[in-house]
Amino acid sequence: MELYYVLLVIIFLLLFKPFVDELRTIYQIIKSFFVPKIDLKEKYGDWAVVTGCTDGIGKALSFELAKRGLNIVLISRNISKLQAVSSDIESMANVKTKIITADFSKGREIYKNIEEELRDLDIGILVNNVGIQYTYPMYFGELPEEEIWSLININIGAATQMTRLVLPKMVSKKKGAIVNLSSGSKLQPIPFMNLYAASKIFLDRFTEALRIEYKNSGITIQCLCPYYVSTKINHFSDHLRRINILTPDVDTYAYHALNTLGVIDNTTGYWPHRVQYAVSCLLPMWIRVYVAGMMYKQFRKDYLKKGAKAID
């Protein structure tokens, strides 16, 4: 009889988290549709800082924030792309922009200049978007040392150090928002994208702990965990760049993601992705790891079969 009760408890525990996740999914989808949009400028401040802003999700978020009335600090490494994005934003919206050139792969040496450039600005929102992925899916032992350091400095170091720079002023004025871009890949280890997936679970845990530390500070600390969005970061796979309801274009994703800021603290940012997340959570970890490994092994084969030509 005791064994029977033990088995019941085990079954309950196995089913409880998926059940809670499903309820949370329904709640988040309803909330994202029916909660009124927040005036981000009024709630957080005049300026938004976006890292990795010249392509992909970062660029789309910069434009969407400008549409909502915020001035934009654009931080990236390519000056010509920065100037083009700055010009396009100022032509589109009645806002100011500020350009800061920084190569986040360089690590510690770049942050002193960024700190000086940001010193006199009323920063309301920090979007830690900058990130890189492998050139293509590969075994960890194949990764060049330089690529390993670049990924650590960009995917982990940038969000950590940028948060350190803006947090004190946000705390002192008791308002602000920090948005960290993680990924749906945080859910499980991903063979052939080992270090990338590990960097995304770091961002998720970093954000969660930060939110608890500063829960009474008046600061919104959000983790965005998108699944696939049609961007150049997935250049190694034509399949991952095809736009559909599960793989939105960057503008669609940015619009929906910003609607969740100040409403949901840990979210995919896009309701079809939340459904994907819920379905994934129903599966045991070993199945998720197996499926992810098979997918990326196939992406690797497809890429190498094409002669490793870059996809524009």
Where are these regions (language model features)?
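Conserved glycine-rich cofactor-binding loop
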Residues: 47, 54-55
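Rossmann-fold scaffold of SDR-type NAD(P)-dependent oxidoreductases
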Residues: 51, 101, 123-132, 155, ...
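Conserved glycine-rich Rossmann-like NAD(P)H-binding loop of the short-chain dehydrogenase/reductase
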Residues: 68-84
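Conserved mid-core segment of classical short-chain dehydrogenase/reductases
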Residues: 108, 112, 116, 133-149, ...
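Catalytic Tyr-X3-Lys loop
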Residues: 123, 132, 141-161, 171, ...
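Active-site helix of classical SDR
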Residues: 163, 199
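Residue(s) in the substrate-gating loop at a strand-loop-helix junction
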Residues: 183
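SDR active-site lid
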Residues: 205, 211-290
